[in-house]
């Protein structure tokens, strides 16, 4: 007499209870393979996103362009946000040339933007945003193993406001469409970055913001290869005040060799102060801070940074009254970072000999018109 189990064995099938166990085992094995594959993919991704810089390890994230106002052409990219390239500019470091970022232990989370430089809001109220610990940069690149050229972007904003994480400057499309590593930086602004206070007496830089930009370019030179960028193929790019900064850096001796091409969009290159103009605005800042006339740079270091920005903000209206001084904020000819007016440097052939693309953006002032109409 043949038992049911013998029939199953003869047919090559398993009895119901054994078939169920085999199916469970098969499912468990498939799940384990999937888990291992996922872990391997995650480990590979973590390795790809974890990068060693001269100050320490950083970990980025994968991001997608989430704008919905038009079709998205940029795919997922690797990003590192808020990487410090300089130390805080608060306290004794205020108004001085920037110092490199101090080292840190462990792996720094670089999934969020760093704070912008202290600045007014677009509403032009008394509200001041940002932090003096602002020397951060952001990196965006497509997922590829190839070494890519680099674009370093300097934001505009009349030397008063702006940041690396303005929505239009986040770099998704430039990185993916042009196959570049995109770097955008924060630097000091307004009375904290674009006002030469040497006439007041005390230790300070004539051009803190320009020095910030040079330090950022040095950081890119020393670190960008670890992010898949080519340090020998760097394009410096900026718009409006950022375009003026590009042209200024083309005439700055310490910036020589830090970039190999330049793009200046709508640059107001004439916005450069002489020593006399800077002296006028330094005294005006002291006056608007309601400080004694003989106040020094050290006295200004003791003041709240938001008050310095607010007082500087009110100086803009004074600048509008003086037709020959179109802004109270601008780089200053200082015989060091900016040895001569950039226009004169270009006329005399003293600029860095790199290819330059320069032009004007149509309707650029329409945004300012919108703000004033509000």
Question: What residues fall within each predicted segment?
Answer:
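Non-catalytic accessory segments of hydrolases
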Residues: 2-207, 231
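Active-site loop->helix "elbow" adjoining a glycine-rich segment at hydrolase catalytic centers
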Residues: 156, 208-212, 240-243
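Alpha/beta-hydrolase fold nucleophile elbow
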Residues: 227-239
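Short glycine-enriched nucleophile-adjacent loop
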Residues: 243-255
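Alpha/beta-hydrolase active-site loop
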Residues: 204-225
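Substrate-access "cap/lid" subdomains that shape
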Residues: 256, 265-374
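Catalytic nucleophile serine of serine hydrolases
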Residues: 238-241, 253, 266
């Amino acid at each position: 007499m043949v038992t049911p189990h013998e029939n199953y064995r003869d047919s090559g099938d398993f009895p119901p209870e054994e078939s169920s166990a085999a199916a469970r085992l098969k499912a468990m094995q498939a799940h384990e393979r999937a888990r291992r594959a996922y872990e391997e993919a995650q480990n590979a991704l973590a390795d790809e996103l974890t990068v060693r810089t001269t100050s320490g390890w950083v970990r980025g994230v994968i991001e997608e362009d989430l704008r919905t106002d038009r079709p998205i052409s940029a795919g997922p990219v690797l990003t590192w946000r808020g990487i410090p390239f300089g130390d805080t500019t608060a306290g004794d470091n205020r108004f001085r040339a920037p110092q490199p970022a101090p080292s840190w232990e462990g792996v720094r989370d670089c999934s969020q933007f760093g704070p912008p430089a202290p600045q007014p809001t677009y509403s032009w109220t008394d509200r001041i945003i940002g932090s003096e610990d602002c020397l951060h940069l952001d990196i965006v690149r497509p997922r590829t193993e190839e070494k890519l050229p680099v674009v370093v972007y300097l934001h505009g904003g009349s030397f008063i406001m702006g940041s690396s994480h303005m929505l239009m400057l986040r770099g998704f499309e430039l990185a993916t469409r042009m196959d570049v590593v995109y770097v955008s930086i924060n630097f000091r602004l307004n009375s904290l970055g674009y006002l030469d206070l040497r006439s007041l007496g005390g230790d300070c830089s004539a051009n803190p913001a320009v020095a910030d930009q040079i330090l950022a370019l040095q950081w890119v030179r020393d670190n960008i290869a670890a992010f898949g960028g080519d340090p020998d193929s760097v394009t410096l790019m900026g718009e409006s005040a950022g375009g003026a900064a590009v042209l200024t850096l083309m005439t700055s001796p310490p910036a020589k060799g830090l970039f190999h091409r330049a793009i200046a969009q709508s640059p107001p290159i004439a916005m450069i102060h002489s020593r006399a103009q800077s002296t006028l605005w330094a005294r005006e800042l002291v006056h608007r801070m309601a400080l004694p006339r003989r106040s020094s740079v050290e006295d200004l270091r003791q003041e709240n940074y938001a008050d310095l920005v607010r007082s500087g903000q009110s100086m803009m209206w004074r600048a509008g009254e003086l037709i020959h001084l179109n802004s109270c904020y601008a780089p200053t000819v200082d015989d060091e970072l900016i040895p001569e007016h950039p226009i004169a440097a270009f006329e005399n052939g003293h600029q860095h000999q790199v290819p330059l693309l320069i032009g004007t953006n149509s309707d650029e002032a329409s945004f300012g018109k919108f703000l004033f109409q509000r």
